[in-house]
Amino acid sequence: MHKIVFVTGNKGKFAEIRDILKTFGIEVIQEKNGYPELQEDELEPIAAHGAQYVANKLNMPVMVDDSGIFINALNGFPGPYSRFVEDKLGNLKVLKMMEGEEDRTAYFKTVIGYCEPGKEPLVFPGVVEGKIAYEERGTGGFGYDPIFEYQGLTFGELGDTEKNKVSHRRRAVDEFLEWFTSKA
């Protein structure tokens, strides 16, 4: 069985990645200690840097996830700063910022960074299009899930099993798995 260290302190992200990868015979080990995060406007260099930094530090294959919600009416805000905005403002303030906005389109993007010790990092993006709901709906998921609507339901309403089939993270992991299984 392959072992990959997944770097996150987020229990929801870890559970989602673990549940997806275990069906492919990959054991995922959580590493809660983070890494010096680059301040960039794009997710790809952040994920690549993090994966390479931790892979070389732990001397093990490492996967990191950098994700963001990009709201078109807000010029892509909060984007790569989504975690900070969620911590400081929360969903209700994001909804307040969206008051009066007709364009509620948004997308979630995850970039999986993967690196083996001493090698160059690889990145695998995944995107899911949707829109910002008018209010929080659902109790499932985490982060922006209760305000991100996909095909009529928020990620918070979908439940973990259904969300894990269609999420941005799932799409990024699928890209990773396509590469990973082709090299095995």
Swiss-Prot record:
The keyword rRNA processing appears for this protein: no
InterPro entries: dITP/XTP_pyrophosphatase (IPR020922), ITPase-like_fam (IPR029001), RdgB/HAM1 (IPR002637)
EC number(s) given by UniProt: 3.6.1.66
Active site positions, chain numbering: 66 (proton acceptor)
Reactions that this protein is recorded to catalyse: XTP + H2O = XMP + diphosphate + H(+); dITP + H2O = dIMP + diphosphate + H(+); ITP + H2O = IMP + diphosphate + H(+)
Manner of cofactor binding, per the entry note: Binds 1 Mg(2+) ion per subunit.
Matches recorded under SUPFAM superfamilies: ITPase-like
Enzyme class: hydrolase
Single GO biological process annotation from the record: nucleotide metabolic process
CC cofactor: Mg(2+)
One GO CC term, this protein: cytoplasm
Subunit-level organization: Homodimer.
Function recorded in the entry: Pyrophosphatase that catalyzes the hydrolysis of nucleoside triphosphates to their monophosphate derivatives, with a high preference for the non-canonical purine nucleotides XTP (xanthosine triphosphate), dITP (deoxyinosine triphosphate) and ITP. Seems to function as a house-cleaning enzyme that removes non-canonical purine nucleotides from the nucleotide pool, thus preventing their incorporation into DNA/RNA and avoiding chromosomal lesions.
Annotated protein name in UniProt: dITP/XTP pyrophosphatase
Organism whose genome encodes this protein: Methanosarcina acetivorans (strain ATCC 35395 / DSM 2834 / JCM 12185 / C2A)
